[in-house]
């Protein structure tokens, strides 16, 4: 990015008025939350790619690997293991993993909705500036006020939409991973119950 490009961005930010600062804050909160959420769902590597190994791991939990291994060890440890106890422990795992992702998704979707709404606030401010310019009558000062109001109205709306769209894609990626994790937990629970209680 050249110095001229940076200057152009700075000019757009200035022309957008005070609402651009609010949009900058919304963008910062949205992208930090979405990035942290993506890291959270990807880091766990909680998927069924090693499903063929699950039965062996359930029989010998100490050999189980990764996050799947941690969940297996947690859900089957203890002498008096029962289907109800496994269910309860899986509910605890879901409470930690799935509910945590859901809370993050609520924040992300709220910020996605806030970005274009904040942009519309700038649009209203810009239109008011345009009306002030029109009310002032003719002349250079009046035309400058109208031009400034038009820039503010357009730049803030555009910026709000530009902030929201990538956030929406990030939200969809987090939601897709969340559903995959939930599905993997259900499959793992079924595999543990089937393996541990197949003789019952």
Please identify what each model-predicted range represents.
Residues 151-169:
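Hydrophobic alpha-helical transmembrane segments of polytopic membrane proteins
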Residues 133-147:
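Membrane-interfacial helix-loop-helix connectors in multipass membrane proteins
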Residues 22-35, 111-121, 163:
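Lipid-exposed faces of alpha-helical membrane segments in multi-pass integral membrane proteins
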Residues 44-137, 170-200:
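Predominantly long cytosolic amphipathic alpha-helical stalk/bundle segments
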Residues 2-52:
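Hydrophobic membrane-targeting segments
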Residues 13-20, 97-115, 149-157:
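Loop-to-transmembrane-helix entry motif
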Residues 17, 31, 72, 119, ...:
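Residue-level signature of catalytic and energy-coupling elements of molecular machines
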